[in-house]
Amino acid sequence: TGPHMLARFSVNERTDLYPDDIALAKAYAKVLIEELKQVVNEGCTYIQFDEPVWTENVKEAKWGAEILNEIISQFPGVKFNLHICGGNAHRKRGYFGRYTDMIDAFKILNIDEIHLEHCSLHYTMLDIFKEWNFQGSISAGVIDQRIDGTETIEKVVKHTEPLLEYFTPNKILLTSECGFGHVPIEI
C-alpha cells in the first residue's frame, strides 16, 4: 500500500500536525522508508506499491506520484512496481478514473514496472502509452476476476496482443485483474 492510499483511508485526528492528505501522506512516506530499509537490508530487491485510490480522485495522482518518488529515491538498485486499479472490492469496480486522466502523474513516476488493469476497463488502457513513453515493464491484467468461469486462450490472447504495440515480449507480464481475493472459493 502506498502513502496516498494510507492517507486517504486514515481518520486524521491530528489536523494540527497533518492539515491535509498531502501532509499525512508525507508522514506515512517517512514511516514506509524506515520499514523498507529493513527489508532491503535483508535482501529485498523488488517492491510493489498499490495506489488504487488514484482512480477515485485523479487530481490527487500527481502529488501521490511525487511522494512515491521521494520513497523510491531512497533505494537505488531496488526495482519498484506500481499497481493502479479501480478498487475492485467484492468483484465490482469502485473507482472510474481513466489512466489518461492521470498522465501528469505517470510521466513523473520513477518506477521499473507498472501493473494496470486491462481486460475489464470501460476504455482502452493502452491509450496511456500514446502519451507516456514508459521504458519499463508492464504487468497487464488479462484475466477477468469478475466472471465465474475460465476464460478461453483466445480471449486471453485477444487481451494480450495489443500490448505488443508498446512493449517487447520480455517486458510483458500477464496477470489477473485486481480483486481476485474476492472470488468465491468454489470457483
Question: What annotation goes with each model-predicted range?
Answer:
Residues 1-187:
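Domain-level signal for soluble alpha/beta catalytic cores
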